[in-house]
């Protein structure tokens, strides 16, 4: 029997803010970091609170006079009431109206809670576009600020994320908790996209010994006595020990929860194989290959052969991998899955928080809150280093900021102008390498064989080039047409000569022909050949003497 243990529970990740004005509200307050938006890890933000005159729940677009965004007190920090619509809707409309941070006031007398985004497509679309920090404060604290702001008084505060993440040493340890399902809509698409986007950064950080990464997957156990139920048989492996909810909510068709557990287990064992090989970054090669080749939509998600092929392409040993996976039908524990249960639900004496939200990033044992995106997660990881030990990637010229900034990779590649045309420009993108070289208005990309690269050419130049090319092509076409016509006429003349010789040879077998008669017969043959392509009539009486098919 398993021993009962007390879990540490879910921790609300907090930051703080300090009010400097008015004096009666002066002090330090806690705020709960939302699981979306962009917390400014390692930084502070000074500004003034704004409270809209109407639509104080922020569930619709604000009109131009809702609040004054022109402030001499720094950033615009929007204060909104909880309720009536999702948190993501409030944050998006506030940001659109000019807010540089959003604070939502709870409408229930309770402790701080973590705000999360819903799984529906609209909420996930908002999540992708929210680029400001979002947090929640308690009802009692928020009412004080709303009262002061409604009276027309200013409230000046400094939001602080500098001490959110600990930085105990020169190496940051982080975990990524995801799920391998790829058919749950926008949320799954975002997770798959993030892992592919993050892979090159993770490999570089790990190779240079800046970080130590560990992948994790959530699991749950079937309640005792229900191991043989339809639910547990479909969603669990190892006799109900490790389960995941059915990905399509259909126990009797499609992929099962057990399929997902097995895929997660294979990924965990791939990570073990990568560590055993002394090249842990090979796990990223496995997971990106698996996500690309073994999709649910292609019917290969639960294919052992597909997963094994991904292992081989990543250069990992498959024999130890098979042993690690073990017998999923056995009524026994699996060491890799037991590690997941302990990590997601630490004992009460642990300082770690239980993992309950997917996806979750844990940095130095503290759960990251915010948008699951390359730049935002990198900023948080960089905040986990001591200031004097941060890798170059965390600097202004690193991946953390604009890749088209002067001195960055994009600038060096695009604006350094390898073709000396002075026309190439750089644009940032959301996917690795996070920039692309594009052409300004009036120009288009054209490949240079001599430079083996793309460069920008004006549309007018292209038009002239196209015009010249068209003229040359027209001349060539006309010449070919004349040549074909001449060849056709020569062919017809030659065929007539051959036909005349054959006619003369045949007629000579029946009657002697002098030259005049032969010419007459030839004229008759030519005339009749023109009237009937399938036969030639000969003889003075008009009776058929020969027929040619």
List PLM regions with ranges.
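Typically the conserved alpha-helix immediately C-terminal to a functionally engaged Cys/Sec
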Residues: 184-207
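Extracellular/luminal ectodomains of secreted and membrane glycoproteins with large N-terminal domains
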Residues: 50, 78, 85, 91, ...
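Short, solvent-exposed loop/turn and secondary-structure capping segments
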Residues: 90-91, 113-116, 186-194, 224-228, ...
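Disulfide-rich extracellular modules and peptides
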Residues: 61, 186, 190, 224, ...
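Conserved N-terminal segment of EGF-like repeats
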Residues: 384-548
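Structured lumen-facing ectodomains of secretory-pathway proteins
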Residues: 2-188, 217
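Loop/turn elements at helix/coil->beta-strand transitions in domains of secreted/extracellular proteins
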Residues: 73-77, 97-101, 170-174, 207-213, ...
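Cysteine-centric redox/oxidoreductase cores and disulfide-bonded domains
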Residues: 220-405, 468-470, 481-484, 492, ...
């Amino acid at each position: 029997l398993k021993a009962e243990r007390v879990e540490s529970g879910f921790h609300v990740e907090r930051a703080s803010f300090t009010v400097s004005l008015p004096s009666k509200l002066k002090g330090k307050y806690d705020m709960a970091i939302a699981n979306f938006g962009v917390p400014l890890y390692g930084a502070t933000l000074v500004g003034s609170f704004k409270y809209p005159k109407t639509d104080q729940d922020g569930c619709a677009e604000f009109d131009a006079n809702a609040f004054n965004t022109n402030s001499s007190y720094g950033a615009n920090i929007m204060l909104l009431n909880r309720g009536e619509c999702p948190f993501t809707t409030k944050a998006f409309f506030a940001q659109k109206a000019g807010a540089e941070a959003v604070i939502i006031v709870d409408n229930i007398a309770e402790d701080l809670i973590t705000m999360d985004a819903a799984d529906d497509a609209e909420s996930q679309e908002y999540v992708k576009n929210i680029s400001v920090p979002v947090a929640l404060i308690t009802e009692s604290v928020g009412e004080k600020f709303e009262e002061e702001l409604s009276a027309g008084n200013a409230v000046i505060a400094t939001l602080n994320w500098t001490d959110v993440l600990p930085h105990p040493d020169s190496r940051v340890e982080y975990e990524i908790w995801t799920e391998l399902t790829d058919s749950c809509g926008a949320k799954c698409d975002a997770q798959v996209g993030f892992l592919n986007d993050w892979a090159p950064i993770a490999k570089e950080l790990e190779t240079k010994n800046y970080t130590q990464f560990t992948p994790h997957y959530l699991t749950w156990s079937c309640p005792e006595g229900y191991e043989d139920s339809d639910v547990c048989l479909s969603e669990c492996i190892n006799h109900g020990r490790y389960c995941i909810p059915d990905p399509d909510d259909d126990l009797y068709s499609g992929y099962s929860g057990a399929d997902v557990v097995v895929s997660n287990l294979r990924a965990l064992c791939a990570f073990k194989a990568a560590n055993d090989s002394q090249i842990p970054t090979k796990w990223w090669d496995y997971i990106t290959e698996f996500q690309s080749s073994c999709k649910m939509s292609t019917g290969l998600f639960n294919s052992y052969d597909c997963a094994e092929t991904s292992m081989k392409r990543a250069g990992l040993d498959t024999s130890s991998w098979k042993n690690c996976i073990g017998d999923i039908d056995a009524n026994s524990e699996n060491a890799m899955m037991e590690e997941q249960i302990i990590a997601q639900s630490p004992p009460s004496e642990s300082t770690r928080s239980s993992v309950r939200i997917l996806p979750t990033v844990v940095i130095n044992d503290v759960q990251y809150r915010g948008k699951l995106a390359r730049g935002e997660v990198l900023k948080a990881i960089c905040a986990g280093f001591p200031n004097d030990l941060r890798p170059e990637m965390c600097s202004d010229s690193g991946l953390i900021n604009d890749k088209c900034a002067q001195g960055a990779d994009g600038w060096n590649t695009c604006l350094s102008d390898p073709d000396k045309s002075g026309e190439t420009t750089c644009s940032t993108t959301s996917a690795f390498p996070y920039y692309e070289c594009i052409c300004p208005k009036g120009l288009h990309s054209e490949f240079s064989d001599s430079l083996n690269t793309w460069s920008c050419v004006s549309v007018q130049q292209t038009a002239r080039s196209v015009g010249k090319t068209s003229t040359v092509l027209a001349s060539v076409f006309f010449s070919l047409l004349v040549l074909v016509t001449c060849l056709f006429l020569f062919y017809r003349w030659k065929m007539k000569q051959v036909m005349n010789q054959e006619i003369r040879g045949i007629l000579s077998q029946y009657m002697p022909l002098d030259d005049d008669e032969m010419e007459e017969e030839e004229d008759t043959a030519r005339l009749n050949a023109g009237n009937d392509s399938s036969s030639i009539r000969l003889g003075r009486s008009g009776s058929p003497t020969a027929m040619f098919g």
